UniProtKB/Swiss-Prot annotation:
GO terms for molecular function: rRNA binding; structural constituent of ribosome. GO terms for biological process: cytoplasmic translation. It comes from Bacillus licheniformis (strain ATCC 14580 / DSM 13 / JCM 2505 / CCUG 7422 / NBRC 12200 / NCIMB 9375 / NCTC 10341 / NRRL NRS-1264 / Gibson 46). Gene3D superfamilies: Ribosomal protein L6, alpha-beta domain. Part of the 50S ribosomal subunit. Belongs to the universal ribosomal protein uL6 family. This is Large ribosomal subunit protein uL6.
């Protein structure tokens, strides 16, 4: 059996999980998330403990088993604690600011780049060189952070660009003169 899928998922206090066929709705202090899972996966809730079972040991069911358990675990964590992803802007004159709900990036282009977050995603700018993406859905937080990073990915020669907090950029040496 999948090691991840076998793990029992304890539902913390303040979080309610409701099952309707294979649609799981998780409500908590930070919000509500709903997702429909594969009909072959059997999801059960007993005494504040959620389990995911699979019908057979074929390859697809083994893969779905652990994935389903992980996604539900992330939903529970998201509505109770939330997720956040930090980004840093490195480069002379590179800065971020917030205009209403939009994130405005000045990263060396002839124009400022505006990014509008999806519903349920919050963008904070604690300083001109730091951006924090927050939300309840781990996938959407990561995707939004990746979209922001893609505006100006770190380049390997000077290391300029937008990078994740703590990301190490592999540096290259420039051309050597003869």
């Amino acid at each position: 059996m999948s090691r991840v899928g076998k793990k029992l998922l304890e539902i913390p206090s303040g979080v309610t999980v409701t099952l309707n066929d294979n649609t799981v709705t998780v409500k908590g202090p930070k919000g509500e998330l709903t997702r429909t899972f594969h009909p072959d996966m059997k999801i059960k809730i007993e005494d504040n403990v959620l389990t995911v079972e699979r019908p057979s040991d074929n390859k697809e069911h083994r893969a779905l088993h652990g994935t389903t358990r992980s996604i539900i675990g992330n939903m529970v964590e998201g509505v109770s604690k939330g997720f956040e992803r930090g980004l840093e802007l490195v480069g002379v004159g590179y800065r971020a600011s917030k205009s209403g709900n939009k994130l405005v990036l000045n990263v060396g282009y002839s124009h400022p780049v505006e990014i509008v977050p999806e519903n349920g995603i919050e963008i904070e700018v604690p300083s001109q060189t730091k951006v924090v993406v927050k939300g309840t859905d781990k996938e959407r937080v990561g995707a939004t952070a990746a979209n922001i990073r893609a505006v100006r990915s770190p380049e390997p020669y000077k290391g300029k660009g937008i990078r994740y907090e703590g990301e190490m950029v592999r540096r290259k040496e420039g051309k050597s003169a003869k």
